[in-house]
């Protein structure tokens, strides 16, 4: 606060340096000195004290008028009391008027006070009447005294308020309606005190009802101000409307009753009846006014009603519509008695809303929760339509408001909420701005309700550290890039994670005639659950045993997959901590199963029967989801996993459990080189543990790197990346270059002074490329590189990474990636064939197309993916053998990936998707072939990860561990292993589980299966829209069906998958011959149907022609070769043809000159993911098994020797693709 500078006193000005100041004689400070006026710097202390002046503030409020104004008007609570008193006074006057009417008797005579009374009678046949009954009434003395006192008080209060609220215009206040009514109802009573004959004068005191209405409105406003309630307009308007109706009826009743004293002499009840009948427009006519004054009053009342009420109703309807838009309030009473969560979003779309509601209410214990949506924008038509459905209208409340306003947070009762979900708007053009809004919302909620759990979704990883205080945070770009990276080495990781984080009962596809759809849908119901080991029926018998032992036997006995645990004293979750980890009763176990153990029932009747027969019992599990019984007895002479033919011996050092170990016999037969499956030990045996998968005894020479390759391998070192592109990235041990690569060497297509390479072939990579197409090199792209360069990946199997960027990366990003080996970038786009060829697409195994930020929003809904879909379709037809993973903005657009207009199988899947959506499935899109195969992904599918964390607070941590975003010491990592024909002696998934647990302590969690299908176009309307023929079906083999309908493939049989063999069906004469045989059989069946033979014949002809049509594919190959030569790329062995421009090639593809869609290799196979399949699931060639491999650095000192010897026995790499060394 500014203060005036005090002038020097004359004595101070004359005093010299050595003089004593005049103020020294008064050293005491004056009482009440303002602390805002410190002592001046000049002179002595005594002089400063003498010059100080006491300043008193707000002296204007000390006047009598201001004090009265503060009490009557300004102060909320005191003014509320005054208005309440005034309201009570007006009601009292109305009550006294009614008492006066009831006590009045016109038959006793009418006249002034103290005068002679006369009786007046009304002649109904005449229109004349007397005014005396209207002017004079009978008023008792006591009643008159009370009315005079009340009128005097009201008059004085009115005069005081007029004085206090005077603003310079007295006439405006005098002619105000309320002042006029006050004078009419109070001043006559005061006059009667001085003029007694007027004491019986009629005074319309009933008009005080309007003053009472006005006082009530002011009182409610003050009350709302006192309790800080601002959202009360709707309540006020309803109250005003009700009071207006009441005042109109009361005024009409009293007015007609009084005027009819000179006419029909009606009582109050009859007058009230007449008013109600008249205002309701019924008008029976049994009671009517007799004289013209009362008739005139009725007309005036009707006119006033016709004017006032429509205005009131209009205001009420307007406020009602505004309230419908804003959503009203969530009452404090409901917030205290009910449970609710708040969803904060920038804009609410129907897809986001349904994903949230379906996932949130999929959990049984959340059925009684309410969802309060706080959104600043108006509710759109689709959302409004959904929220009107009874299923959601009773549980979802939409409030229009901002999370930055405390008033809106109060409306949502955020401080009473069970949780607050804050979601970013991913479809914004400026995603950084969207993150900033999310951060502010999170801060506002934390400030307003610090105890409310926060679940925050952030887009950019560099913004994540701003919301680290939140209970759960999901960074979209971190998860997206890590998942797309794992898709390249563990196929369909995106599908695996998506299915795990969606709540499902595994009932999808169970009505389908296709076996793979039933199995795939059943396994999709597996989720991650947790339970304390001491409370678990699944795991408590394994206390004191190794983690691997418990995982294998729990899967064998109950069909559950134990994937990790958490120590009671440690907050870190460990995935597959390895066989050296001994389970304790206090451990929290995390497992994959159809449903949680608490909802499972255990049936042991069959086990008791087997025990009576002398056989080793097998526990059966039959949960509420009807999980089939797991039969784990192997057949056909192979080594059995049960205890039927094994020797039992006491366990060594094991406590609890069954006290036995498996001692499995060796395989019979001469010339067999397959080892038997060793038992899983209760306690770890360091000498027997190998850190890699040992499904076959490959020779050491097969995996020993050559000398040339060994030189390149030695160049890499293990360490932590020195430069993180953003704050908050988890440190991960990676393969690094000993010396950072210069920025110029990171450019793939341009040589520099360090090397002259200008294309991918010149580098001579040993492994095939992984190409990532992105618009910009954002910080999230760093998380694509880290999982592919993690220390636990084999150095021999590191794939070169090429970043195909639309815009040049900045130096900050290059500084972060220059330490990684074989990471390059190139400027270009996926819609440019030259760019694709220059970055080495013909030498690549995987192409990842990342959704572009600039195209995430479109004027028309769901059109944001149009460009991406068309570009990927072009590449799909140009390079059919390339594995392309595409990110889309909208999951519903995945049906356009690898689109084939005449594919009846896709049409059948579309019908199945609609059926599942009608059944209320959260995974209706799961049967789309691109999604099942892991070739398409949308980050919105991972929104459920944040929602599911409300019930499972560990899901985000487990997902980040699986994706390699976080590394916890002692925790395992996700990898994959390919099953070849040489490994089919294992036969079943359960035996594979035992093999992996006993040899390398790896935990399998699922299978990625690829099957060969011949897609047809049936013409029987009663038949399904697809006919699938497996290779085994073509060979007319009869295979045993398991409980889940899985095929029992023979060891010599092969299933044509997309990971093996050529993409050209010409090279498979057996497939072609069998397909034609199948077509002829189908043709013979079709001829039995009358009227359909010509159609079937045309269709068979078309199929035959499509099997032999290869000219278009050859033409496309020539076009691509020609573009390579034009760009100066190596084309050894290609014929010289005339050059064509890149646009010519693209146009010829898009115009449909290539007609051989039905023969492409990708289109003859389908792939899908089986999460935690039953133990008796048969393995098939080209199956890829998802593994959680234990941390290689967990026990380096004790296992370094065994790891050195294990390298020669590794079956195959974690990379699911063929890892043959190829010199490009």
Curated annotation (Swiss-Prot):
Residue intervals passing through the bilayer: 80-112, 140-164, 179-194, 202-219, 233-260, 291-324
Listed Low complexity bias regions: 13-27, 1045-1055, 1198-1215
GO BP of this protein: potassium ion transmembrane transport; protein homotetramerization; regulation of postsynaptic membrane potential
List of glycosylated residues: 119, 123
KW Oxidoreductase (keyword) present: no
Ranges where the record places region Disordered: 1-37, 644-675, 1038-1066, 1198-1224
Catalytic activity: K(+)(in) = K(+)(out)
Residues annotated for K(+) 3 binding in this entry: 747, 750, 755, 757, 763
Classification via PANTHER family: CALCIUM-ACTIVATED POTASSIUM CHANNEL ALPHA CHAIN, POTASSIUM CHANNEL SUBFAMILY T MEMBER 1
Stated name of the protein: Potassium channel subfamily T member 1
Source species taxonomy: Eukaryota, Metazoa, Chordata, Craniata, Vertebrata
